[in-house]
Amino acid sequence: MSTRVVSTDAVAVGAARLFQTLGGACAVLAGAATLLYSVAFVVLKDATLYSLLQMVGSLAATVALVALYERVRQADAGLALWAVLAGVVAGFGSAIHGAYDLANALNPPRADVLAD
């Protein structure tokens, strides 16, 4: 059995590289989900599918935005911070909207809640 000493800098670089890879994969996922969302919304008109795609795509976009922030924050920290905050808030807002529509598609509300 061998023992290998790994410095904390090497671990930090590996974790950063892993998150950049995850961010890239989430950016591709967000793009694909957005394209499929538009087809489901306009052509298929399937509320369950487009709500799920909106929720997944917007959550994946927030991961991609944070990974992008990590890459550009050295250029202009203030602008990068403002952009990532605006993007993440918008992403979570879109995810909440998609989750609300998904809940209504799976469990349609009654027309008159006071009827019982």
What spans do the regions from the language model cover?
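Hydrophobic, aromatic-enriched alpha-helical segments typical of multi-pass transmembrane helices
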Residues: 2-116
